[in-house]
Amino acid sequence: MKPSEPKSVPSSFFDETFRQSSDPWRYTSNFYEISKFRTTIKCLPKVQFKNAFEIGCAIGVLTQKLAKKCDRLLSVDYSEVGLEEARKRCADLPQVRFEQMQIPQQFPTEKFDLILFSEVGYYLTMPDLLIAKQKIIDQLLPGGYLLMVHFRYPVESFILNGDIVHDTFIQESAQFLKHLGDPRQQKFWIDIRGYHKRYRMDLFQRL
């Protein structure tokens, strides 16, 4: 019998994770996560964006910070349980819209000048990652930006790892995306705690 093909991590995994804890990855209390979110916002290539798309918003901690840079922001997650917390957290941000989506099977049809693909790609199989990549390219406006952020090391629930996710975009998208490198390197920051080594960050611009 042929072994079954691996599948991307389902929404039920994230629903159960958020039922067990309202903040399972300690976004609000872990200094590594707090520092990473702060760095992500500082590495945005523009002061303000007209229409942004956040893939994998979880409970909306980064969404709160990102919304200040966006006239409109669509934030999606696999988990409706996580989105309930996100909606409460961002209730005073009228420019933010939340939707439950199973990326890449579900994907918005509108165009964006910023797409943030953060800590999601390694939950996908390679075929699904390639589909997501193409849909991101299709919905990114010419001159628009894609910022990717992913943890680099193995975790039991991951199908891929952060380096594979980012390298796939670099190697497979040169015709459509200009790779601008790691924006942290342009800031000349001193990474005293060594946090930057733990996650990958790459910025792209749509050709």
Short names for language-model regions:
Residues 1-47, 51-55, 59-110, 124-138, ...:
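Class I (Rossmann-like) S-adenosyl-L-methionine-dependent methyltransferase catalytic domain
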Residues 120:
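Hydrophobic adenine-recognition pocket in adenosine-nucleotide-binding enzymes
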